[in-house]
Design a protein with these regions (language model features):
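Glycine-/Pro-rich loop/turn segments that contact NAD(P) or position catalytic residues
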Residues: 75-174
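Structural motif
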Residues: 4, 67-68, 108
Length: 244
């Protein structure tokens, strides 16, 4: 790509893998994170910016002029804590979307969410309403007007083996997927036209990985068009608030 790619949460477990894959492709990468110490552990080719998704003013400079943004922030589970699901995967997403509109050309936005977000009775929702807030963050992305991809991984593992990847929709099944494969999906979404405007779940099984991701994305249904009314309102930086 001709412009930098920002990885928000790029010092986290998935974010670091995304960063390395982009660098391997020769991309200019801006990593946004809260820990200067962890930032020093990044490859020297990556440009680190100290930023916090809960503080909109810290996002404007690192996101300015980026051709794409990959949001890999990992939430906490305490609803009253500083890394609550609300503040990281809803408010933080909205703040990043608002900052993303600062350039002349709207960037592509890739959001790492999770499977089960439409199942409010799933046990994961007991942790600070994790699933409710993730779904609200997804909705903000879909309503933003930016070109986007929403990735919903299954249970995450650290396996390094090559895997057969399944992309699916409907949020009905279960499964596992490695962080390695999630990172690859995020990166591939930037280069595959069929990945635009889709939300999908992913899981992996023993087998060979895809040689070409475009056919996998091409089998997915695009999301219903977002309503224009109210879309811009969703782009304003926000303080935490409750979901009705």
């Amino acid at each position: 790509m001709n412009s930098p790619i920002a990885v928000i949460g790029g010092t986290g477990r998935v974010g670091r893998l995304v960063t390395r894959r982009l660098l391997d492709r020769g991309e200019a990468v801006r990593v946004v994170g809260r820990s200067a110490e962890r930032g020093r552990e990044l490859p020297e080719q990556a440009q680190f910016f100290l930023g916090d998704v809960r503080e909109p003013e810290t996002l404007r400079i690192p996101l300015r002029g980026c051709s794409a943004i990959i949001y890999t922030v990992e939430p906490g589970t305490d609803p009253a804590g500083p890394d609550s699901p609300e503040s990281t995967v809803h408010t933080g997403v909205r703040n990043a979307l608002a900052a993303a509109w600062g350039g002349a050309v709207p960037p592509q936005f890739v959001l790492v969410s999770q499977r089960y977000v439409t199942r409010r009775d799933h046990p994961m929702n007991a942790y600070g309403r994790m699933l409710d807030w993730r779904l609200a963050g997804e909705d903000a992305v879909r309503m933003s007007g930016l070109p986007y991809t929403v990735v919903r991984p299954s249970w995450l593992t650290d396996l390094e083996e090559d895997s057969r990847i399944t992309l699916e929709q409907g949020d009905r099944r279960d499964g596992y997927v490695s962080r390695r494969d999630v990172a690859e999906a995020c990166v591939q979404a930037l280069y595959c036209p069929s990945a635009r405007g889709v939300t999908f779940e992913m899981r992996s099984e023993p087998g060979s990985g895809p040689a070409d991701w475009e056919p996998l994305f091409a089998r997915l249904r695009t999301d219903e068009p977002a309503r224009e009314a109210g879309a811009r309102q969703l782009l304003a930086p926000v303080a935490d608030r409750a979901i009705a």
